[in-house]
Amino acid sequence: MAFFTAASKADFQHQLQTALAQHLGDKALPQVTLFAEQFFSLISLDELTQRRLSDLVGCTLSAWRLLERFDRDQPEVRVYNPDYEKHGWQSTHTAVEVLHPDLPFLVDSVRMELNRRGYSIHTLQTNVLSVRRSAKGELKEILPKGSQGKDVSQESLMYLEIDRCAHAGELRALEKAILEVLGEVRVTVADFEPMKAKARELLTWLGKAKLKVPAEELKEVRSYLEWLLDNHFTFLGYEEFSVADEADGGRMVYDEKSFLGLTRLLRAGLSKDDLHIEDYAVAYLREPVLLSFAKAAHPSRVHRPAYPDYVSIRELDGKGRVIRECRFMGLFTSSVYNESVNDIPFIRGKVAEVMRRSGFDTKAHLGKELAQVLEVLPRDDLFQTPVDELFSTALAIVRIQERNKIRVFLRKDPYGRFCYCLAYVPRDVYSTETRLKIQQVLMERLQASDCEFWTFFSESVLARVQFILRVDPKSRIDIDPARLEEEVIQACRSWQDDYSSLVVENLGEAKGTNVLADFPKGFPAGYRERFAPHFAVVDLQHLLSLSEQRPLVMSFYQPLAQGEQQLHCKLYHADTPLALSDVLPILENLGLRVLGEFPYRLRHQNGREYWIHDFAFTYAEGLDVDIQQLNEILQDAFVHIVSGDAENDAFNRLVLTANLPWRDVALLRAYARYLKQIRLGFDLGYIASALNAHTDIARELVRLFKTRFYLARKLTAEDLEDKQQKLEQAILGALDEVQVLNEDRILRRYLDLIKATLRTNFYQPDGNGQNKSYFSFKFNPKAIPELPRPVPKYEIFVYSPRVEGVHLRGGKVARGGLRWSDREEDFRTEVLGLVKAQQVKNAVIVPVGAKGGFVPRRLPLGGSRDEIQAEAIACYRIFISGLLDITDNLKEGEVVPPANVVRHDEDDPYLVVAADKGTATFSDIANGIAAEYGFWLGDAFASGGSAGYDHKGMGITAKGAWVSVQRHFRERGIDVQKDNISVIGIGDMAGDVFGNGLLMSDKLQLVAAFNHMHIFIDPNPDAASSFVERQRLFNLPRSSWADYDAKLISAGGGIFLRSAKSIAITPEMKARFDIQADRLAPTELIHALLKAPVDLLWNGGIGTYVKSSKETHADVGDKANDGLRVDGRELRAKVVGEGGNLGMTQLARVEFGLHGGANNTDFIDNAGGVDCSDHEVNIKILLNEVVQAGDMTEKQRNALLVKMTDAVGALVLGNNYKQTQALSLAQRRARERIAEYKRLMGDLEARGKLDRALEFLPSDEELAERISAGQGLTRAELSVLISYSKIDLKESLLKSLVPDDDYLTRDMETAFPALLAEKFGDAMRRHRLKREIVSTQIANDLVNHMGITFVQRLKESTGMSAANVAGAYVIVRDVFHLPHWFRQIENLDYQVPADIQLTLMDELMRLGRRATRWFLRSRRNELDAARDVAHFGPRIAALGLKLNELLEGPTRELWQARYQTYVDAGVPELLARMVAGTSHLYTLLPIIEASDVTGQDTAEVAKAYFAVGSALDLTWYLQQITNLPVENNWQALAREAFRDDLDWQQRAITVSVLQMQDGPKEVEARVGLWLEQHLPLVERWRAMLVELRAASGTDYAMYAVANRELMDLAQSSQHGVCIP
């Protein structure tokens, strides 16, 4: 409906006038406008604006037309339904218009008639208009309200809108009735003064007449008439009559000339029956009294809707007989009912007489009580009741004042037309219901046709109800007042009375009385109407059974009056009512269709409320169960759903359909929620419907689970397997009958999951012996079909209605953080992505990757930060408990399985966790829970607690990432500690990684940064002052960019809210960030900042801001940052430092790298945090053993941990340094060695260790394209491969004997601060993770120094295992002291060009590679690290010092050239000498072996070896072999074979030379002699070299032939040595 609006009443009148002008001429408009102002003057603006303006215009014009012509002798009444076509306006109501000369009672009387007929009045407008009319009644003028004058008349105009009358006959009948009422008003008003005159006339007559009446009585009657005339009576009519005798009574004989007022209308045309009166009425009318009272037989239609009162003056003859009666009909005015009885003539005499007869002292209690009773008695009773009856009644009322009981006093009207009843009821039991019961008894016993009542409350304990009942005067019902009173008492015997009796009867008097006192108001009226008291007693007992442990009780019942399919259940609980919107879905999900609900509240005297909810329901379609048989499990299910222990969803229907208890249903739901997380493809509702459609299979699945994890405790392995097989076959057989493919798939996946479940806490009670509120399941992920990749080794799923979470582990010894996720729908997908990154990040530490995530499902909506945090912590505790519930423990070195847990897997006691997003401060909580469980790791369970290393305080993650940044810039000739670099950051100074990172150097020029709230812009910052300000913000708790001192920001900068509509781009911002626009939205500005030319992009925030151009935003999965994100190729930062996780997609990193950017990956850059935590855990495991042995207190342990903080940090940063260095070394040769990486990836894929697509590594086709483009693998891709190579090597070492080798286990010491190795060396060798730590240290050391493909390359070329390769490497490492030389090179940072450093390291790597290969080829399975290092190490050290003295000819020249190059570059001489001779150092291995064979001095053998090489030009030949291009693996293997052959042949010739008989002693002479003795073959060899030098191009075939020639030469001596 369209309403109008108006600012004021004047505004409304203006709008109305404007609208009226469209319907009226200029002449009529002023008058109608004036009329309208008066017409609506009494109506509020609010009421007017609830109506259409068009309707107001219509009713105004309609009323005006009524007013235009009026005959004052004939009132105008119009009752009609406004219709647009007929009347020009319309309304949903019926309109009533009345125009009448202004008279009293008009409005009240019309309104009374409408109410009497049952019409609701919606609009009522009444106005008294001052008008001038013509003689014909035509309206001449409307005058201002209240105008007077000779020709001015006052006319009452009424406009009403009432309920719509549907029929024309109804409209006519109403119009006629209103006209009748108006007629009655007219005669009443017209005769009002004549009636008063008649009263005065009677008053005069009484003063003159000589009546045989006591003077006092006469005086009181006269006083009464005077009092009546003094505005105490509204005269409606007057009549005079006498009584004539008839055989069966009498007859009223009216004097028609006496009629005044209403009697003129009411007495016309009375029939004989109307005039007949009964004999008792005749007797009353002939009583010789002057003044009498009665009630009229019909209600008044004028002024007030009540039965009018008769006040009669009887004229007596000289004998005291009644001659006639002068009777006034009217209504006592309201003042009469408020006036004291002592001020009302006639009544006051009665009251005084009653007081006198009582004998009560008026100042005493009873006297005051009686006076009060008389004061408040209904005036009708006081007027009409004789003194004798009044006395007895008043005294009886006084007697009950102090007693809580019901009394009834009945009095008949003298005419027999009414019965008057006063009922006194105790206030505390009085109600409408009580009044209706009394009324019903009275109506039935008195056969009354109508009843009016008035209720009176005073300070008394009793309430009084006055009933006036209309009865048939002809009926002669003999009523026994005592019996009637008893019937009323019985009728009023309340439900509460019966209830109270039953409570005492059932609970005993003492308890019952107390309970009734506890619930003083008992059950509410609505309850009492529906239930008998004995039901209430049962319900009360249920309420009394409520407790904290049992907060909800449920009861089913079936009313006898209802069908079998309709049931009821009652829910009982305390405090707040159950919301229907909450309960209804629960019942419906249980398979019940709710038909209605009736809530009832009981209030305890202590203020606590108790509730009963009565639900009527039937079964949902398709359900056919016996509710009584399932009563217990259904009640149990409902109670746990309401309490939140179980979820409310479609799975609950299984309670009825499958007869499953709620926990079994919850079990199936938990599996379904896991199925959702592993992306089965069906929503939970469909999964539930599949189970409900096949309840037999659902039951069997639960049986299988119970058998595996409960019955298995009591069964032998054989019996368990037999039972499982039978159940599985039964399920498979049932599945064959399933017709719907999707349902079959769901049910089979349930079977798969149950079989893949290794452990569960489902049957593990809590400390109180109760079922746990959460479930945890340990899975064998490889047994779950179609699990999203990568597939972890183990997985634990924790489920409860409050929280869900998963923990994924890559192996038995695995570690990673637990994050508070907000992705309820796919948190496992989030965790899977993180564990994938964690797996490669953990390549540098002992454990393999693990990750966990939990989602609080019931965070308080609109809760405060503290409330949300509290709930998250509670959920975290549940999650941690779920993990520990099914994890083995260690006690005194023995594995202790968890109690009441059936294990279908091996011992698995290693479980450690760490902080992650949202759980940074939760480590102490986790360790506290671990302590409660007595878990063997103690506070090593969760690193970073109060007795652990504070990552933010140490700044370890940022420092580790800064190592990467330093390397990127160092390799570009920039020292970030000395040279200014421009930075754009993601995050704020309150953050750990961002804040610590931007304090790593005071040379950083932070030109821009942003977080979720602000954008910080400082186009031309001062590095020094901005550093100090950043430091201040970092130290300021909960700081933000808004706290930054704006005075320190350079011109054109500022701090802007991300919520701003737009940001003005200053010239300085345009210049710094290469922006063209004048204004940008905050999102657009951040987008531009990410693409700005800058030295460093430092990511310390949360979110993914860079994708590849081949990816969509949807692929990224970070919707919040879609508007900010840029492509990798759009980045113009020179370097990206990834302190935060997931800032770039992997493909974005690759794209950035391919476009010249310098970056690693997040798991490389920010590995410091996880590395630090691993050191902490390993140290604590070590020291906890020491504490348990009594060799140290926990306090001492904690002090030692603090003392080692810097040492631990140094170890961590050393790992970061080494790993990024290894990446730089790999990147140098990434293009030329691309085939090696291809082979590595292929091998890892073939062994199921790598999913190339999942890790975004290039396919073979993409590698071919890279080769064509002259590109190799990027650092981001190499980061993945270095991690995988370490992981793979660690696994291989753990499966071998390498970690058990006494010599090799010394590497373990490098994982700990030196202080620990010194003090607790023995305990360290007993470390529970000794094998893992040794394997980790060797793998890290090997890959960091020898390269990513080293192990793979040597495995392929030697056929040896990875463990053999690692063992040989350790020998080589220690024989040649490689770590020492690497450190010497690393110490040259910023002293020599980075490229020189990498070249030096390349040479060391080549030495290590060739030497390792030599050991593998020469020793095979006879490697003995301790022996070989002892044998070769000292001799190589000795020879190495004088290597340059041993070299000669071209060999020496080559060495000298290299040496000089290095020295010229700034390399220290000793280091330059060593590295320049690495290729010759390698030859010391065959030299030493030749020495062993010949028994000659090693130095002499070396001279011979190098002399042979010089004589045969083998150094040049070796260089040619080394320079052979490698395009495939076969060529690589051939090249290595050529070198091996050359090594053997040179050694063989050397041995042959040294073993010559009768030769000269000098080496040169012996070599010369040997050459002469083998001259033909020597010449053939030299000729071969000539051809090789002359060849325009060389290929492998040529060198194969050349090698054969050399072999012939080597074997030509009888002293040839067999190839090892």
Swiss-Prot record:
Induction: Expression induced by arginine in an ArgR-dependent manner (27-fold). Induced to a much lesser extent by ornithine, glutamate, and aspartate (1.7- to 5-fold). Activity subject to allosteric control by arginine and citrate, which function as positive and negative effectors, respectively. Contains disulfide bonds (interchain). Keywords: Disulfide bond, NAD, Oxidoreductase. It comes from the Bacteria. Disruption phenotype: Reduced growth when arginine serve as the sole source of carbon and nitrogen. One of its GO terms (molecular function) is L-aspartate:2-oxoglutarate aminotransferase activity. Homotetramer. Involved in arginine catabolism by converting L-glutamate, into 2-oxoglutarate, which is then channeled into the tricarboxylic acid cycle. Can also utilize other amino acids of the glutamate family. This is NAD-specific glutamate dehydrogenase. It comes from Pseudomonas aeruginosa (strain ATCC 15692 / DSM 22644 / CIP 104116 / JCM 14847 / LMG 12228 / 1C / PRS 101 / PAO1). The lineage of its organism: Bacteria, Pseudomonadati, Pseudomonadota, Gammaproteobacteria, Pseudomonadales. The gene is gdhB.
